[in-house]
Amino acid sequence: MNLITLIIMAMAMTTALYTINTYTTMKPDINKLSPYECGFDPLGNARTPISIQFFLVAILFILFDLEIVLLLPTPWSMNTNPSNTTILLITMLLTILTLGLLYEWLQGGLEWTE
């Protein structure tokens, strides 16, 4: 009996949500047509040039985001199989990323004004 009730409630909820979505009107207003937080015009040309500094910071963000993805499961893997190879690889990865960030900083790639 409970399974039938659950199926009926799911179908009723699906029908109600579909009906609400179908019959509500999409009215564009000034807030929906305005640029979002970034300040770019959403209806403008997609081929506008971007600054090199912005591009470099975006690439650095992606690299350090990838670093977090690679290093986040490390404590769990160290619990199952702690080895010197894992520690060496983590240390090498952090050293390479730190040296790259230091090089970028010394070259002035992180400066917004010139």
UniProtKB/Swiss-Prot annotation:
Give EC number(s), comma-separated.
7.1.1.2
Task: Tell me where it resides.
Answer: Mitochondrion membrane
User: What coarse category fits the chief subcellular location reported for this protein?
Assistant: mitochondrion
Q: How does it sit in the membrane?
A: Multi-pass membrane protein
**Keywords tagged on the record:** Electron transport, Membrane, Mitochondrion, NAD, Respiratory chain, Translocase, Transmembrane, Transmembrane helix, Transport, Ubiquinone
Gene Ontology terms, MF aspect: NADH dehydrogenase (ubiquinone) activity
GO annotation, cellular component aspect: mitochondrial membrane; NADH dehydrogenase complex
Spell out where the chain crosses the membrane: 3-23, 52-72, 86-106
Catalytic activity line of the entry: a ubiquinone + NADH + 5 H(+)(in) = a ubiquinol + NAD(+) + 4 H(+)(out)
Indicate the enzyme's highest-level EC class: translocase
Q: Mind telling me which Pfam families this protein's record contains?
A: Oxidored_q4
Q: Which InterPro entries match?
A: NADH_UbQ/plastoQ_OxRdtase_su3, NDAH_ubi_oxred_su3_sf
Q: Which family does it belong to?
A: Belongs to the complex I subunit 3 family.
Q: Which PANTHER family does the entry mention?
A: NADH-UBIQUINONE OXIDOREDUCTASE CHAIN 3
Per the entry, what this protein does is:
Core subunit of the mitochondrial membrane respiratory chain NADH dehydrogenase (Complex I) that is believed to belong to the minimal assembly required for catalysis. Complex I functions in the transfer of electrons from NADH to the respiratory chain. The immediate electron acceptor for the enzyme is believed to be ubiquinone.
- The protein depicted here goes by the name NADH-ubiquinone oxidoreductase chain 3
**Quick one: which gene encodes this?**
MT-ND3
